[in-house]
From Swiss-Prot:
Family: Belongs to the universal ribosomal protein uS4 family.
Protein's name according to its UniProt entry: Small ribosomal subunit protein uS4
GO biological process, one term: translation
Entry-linked SUPFAM superfamilies: Alpha-L RNA-binding motif (SSF55174)
Sequence ranges assigned to domain S4 RNA-binding in this UniProt record: 94-156
Residue ranges with Basic residues bias: 1-12
Taxonomic lineage of the native organism: Bacteria, Pseudomonadati, Pseudomonadota, Alphaproteobacteria, Hyphomicrobiales
Assembly and interaction partners: Part of the 30S ribosomal subunit. Contacts protein S5. The interaction surface between S4 and S5 is involved in control of translational fidelity.
Organism: Methylobacterium nodulans (strain LMG 21967 / CNCM I-2342 / ORS 2060)
Amino acid sequence: MSKRIQAKHKLDRRMGQNIWGRPKSPVNRREYGPGQHGQRRKGKLSDFGTQLRAKQKLKGYYANITEKQFRRYYAEAIRLRGDSGENLIGLLERRLDAVIYRAKFVATPFAARQFVNHGHIKVNGQRVNIPSFLVKPGDVIEVKESSKQLEIVVVASQLAERDVPDYIEVDHGKMTARFTRVPTLSEVPYPVHMEPNQVIEFYSR
């Protein structure tokens, strides 16, 4: 088992939830944390513990964004007008790797990050290899012509359910997507309940 898969399994067990909705998640078989003490009954979390778990879960979902980068999203979320929690979700869903994953061009957030890193994506006709690049409403994202027959793309297009959210328009035949608008929390198809306002509270302490 690769270190990446082990890390994903560990986060699922720590949270006691199937963070990415994966069929092979260990919590589908057991609902306790990792390690020799994982089966102990868990007590009620403190406010800090609840906020920390909310942060770990949301940060982990987006392919384990670094703490430095995640804190920058928090700073931008509170700077913007409106609800800071909603702003945080909007920023995360604008990430190029998140859009690639939502469009079902690849099967997982981790694969999406690697796919962008390797230069397989164009935004408005220009190659972009930065997973954290923030797309804007109206931006057109496409898989490079030379990359459309890669196994990772072919397998995803054949096996992935085409439950693309409403804020992304996709043509799977041409492997193009258009980001139409910034979504709200209720529109994002998370497999588990996310609490961005708890994340805001964590960083606001």
